[in-house]
């Protein structure tokens, strides 16, 4: 009986002390912004489907720089060219990092590539490797035959549609063109020609893209991970990670097969496997590093048609008109 009584008397004292300590804690000087609710902040006030419009309206009310409280994460939003230049150019090193979000960290093998990796010595060395061996002008030029071939294939398809008076969906064609070129350059395969593999490929891509943009509440309120588990997000993320890891491993094993039929020019996986055996760099590349880089290419090989830019379609139409008139 004595212990519950002591707890009843001491807990309120500790609670009041905690509240007083929070009040005494000096708040950081942040730009103005909408008031949020305790713990969740402004999360309930934002709708991802119309987020750009909401941020635009907030900038009209609070100015070109304002703050949001996303759970326990403080966020600064800028909406003017002058401030964007300050952040992205003049102070790019200070703002070069990305927040560590669960799906991105999991699917990128804890930031083992250069997109989700924090700015540090590892990132700088990986960037040097990519610039020198993967994205160099010589390497890009070596894939010109692939680009020319795939563009010819697209023109043939458009010509076939035109001769049969069929409707041409430029968005689908451009998505297919981009996806095929990246896959051939990165993996050495043309998944558009393979029935079951094509279905598996696009299924993995769709799930990867969805998970990358899925809201995990534990990313913003750390002690709420159980909510993500109840919603099945952790199981879904783990399942997709294992399926992708299996896919990456199949690609690597295929390239390491001594009996593999080589098409001629090395693809990106061939280059990465060579770099793995090269000990002249300050970091030792592992298979996880290679898989992390493959994830970036894998993700970039697909663009959802609903997000496809109208501007790109206009440029493509203009390019086709130039070909027709010349």
Model-derived features: positions:
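Terminal signal-anchor or tail-anchor transmembrane helices
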Residues: 1-26, 180
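Hydrophobic transmembrane alpha-helices
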Residues: 2-3, 18-21, 45, 59, ...
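Hydrophobic alpha-helical signal peptides and transmembrane signal-/tail-anchor segments
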Residues: 4, 133, 318-321
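Short hydrophobic/aromatic segments of transmembrane alpha-helices and their interfaces
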Residues: 7, 66-69, 124, 286-290, ...
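Cytochrome P450 substrate-recognition site 1
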Residues: 25-146, 170, 174-184, 197-225
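Short hydrophobic alpha-helical segments that form membrane-spanning helices or hydrophobic packing faces
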Residues: 39-46, 87-88, 305-314, 324-326
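Cytochrome P450 heme-thiolate monooxygenase catalytic core
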Residues: 99-107, 141-311, 318-326
């Amino acid at each position: 009986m004595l212990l519950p009584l002591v707890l009843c008397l001491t807990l309120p004292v500790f609670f009041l002390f905690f509240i007083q300590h929070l009040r005494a804690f000096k708040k950081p000087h942040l730009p103005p912004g909408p008031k949020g609710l305790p713990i969740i902040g402004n999360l309930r006030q934002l709708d991802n489907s119309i987020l750009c419009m909401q941020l635009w309206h907030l900038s009209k009310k609070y100015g070109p720089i304002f703050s949001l409280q996303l759970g326990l994460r403080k966020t600064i939003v800028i909406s003017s060219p002058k401030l964007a230049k300050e952040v992205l150019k003049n102070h790019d090193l200070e703002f070069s990092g990305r927040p560590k979000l669960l799906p991105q960290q999991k699917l990128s093998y804890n930031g083992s590539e250069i997109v989700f990796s924090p700015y540090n010595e590892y990132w700088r060395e990986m960037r040097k490797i990519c610039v020198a061996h993967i994205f160099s002008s010589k390497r890009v030029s070596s894939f010109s035959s692939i680009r020319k071939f795939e563009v010819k294939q697209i023109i043939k398809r458009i010509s076939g549609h035109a001769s049969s008076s069929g409707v041409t969906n430029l968005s689908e064609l451009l998505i297919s063109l981009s996806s095929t070129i990246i896959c051939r350059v990165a993996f050495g395969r043309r998944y558009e020609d393979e029935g079951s593999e094509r279905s598996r490929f696009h299924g993995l891509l769709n799930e990867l893209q969805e998970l990358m943009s899925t809201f995990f509440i534990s990313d913003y309120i750390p002690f709420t991970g159980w909510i993500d588990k109840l919603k099945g997000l952790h199981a879904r993320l783990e399942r997709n990670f294992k399926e992708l890891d299996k896919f990456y491993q199949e690609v690597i094993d295929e390239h390491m097969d001594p009996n593999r039929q080589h098409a001629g020019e090395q693809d990106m996986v061939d280059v990465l496997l060579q770099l793995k055996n090269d000990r002249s760099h300050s970091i030792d590349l592992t298979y996880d590093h290679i898989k992390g880089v493959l994830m970036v290419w894998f993700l970039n090989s697909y663009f959802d048609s609903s997000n496809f830019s109208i501007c790109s379609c206009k440029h493509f139409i203009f390019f086709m008109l130039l070909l027709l008139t010349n």
